[in-house]
Amino acid sequence: GFVATRNWAEGAYPSECWYNLEGDDVLGILSTRNPEETILWSGDKDLKQIPGLHLDNEGNTYSISDLEADVYFYRQVLTGDTTDGYPGCPGIGPKTAEKLIPEQDFTEASAWGTVIKQYEKKGFGPDYALTQARLARILRNTEYTFDELQLWTPLTIPSTPPTTPSTKE
């Protein structure tokens, strides 16, 4: 089972155990810490927000650029991920998110502005959008130092007051 396999792997290969972090965060941190020495292999689509070299299940490698990773992250903030337990912005699926956050002319400031605007259209404020972004975010090397997490923060935070979801019917 799992425990026997883990014990074998820890004995056969250099290994570490990181407490209080999810496995995908550890992968994101390690991959962005040593991008020349790391290949990510995972069935978790969320890891598309991590730049670097990836391996698919057929054994093919492909590269995800910083731009592609950042675009994927902002789209994920809009679509949410029910498997990971955050809903995203109501009514926005992958195709809509792709139209709202295009790769062409992408900037983080414009992407974040789009995210805020979409959440506000649904009656949510910037604080709620920020919570969704932090739930979507897979940590990168610059966002974690030993036992110290730096919560993701957008480059610009709008100065509008926080709002709560409307109760219109």
Positions of predicted regions on the chain:
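Extended two-metal-dependent nuclease catalytic cores across DNA- and RNA-processing enzymes
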Residues: 1-168
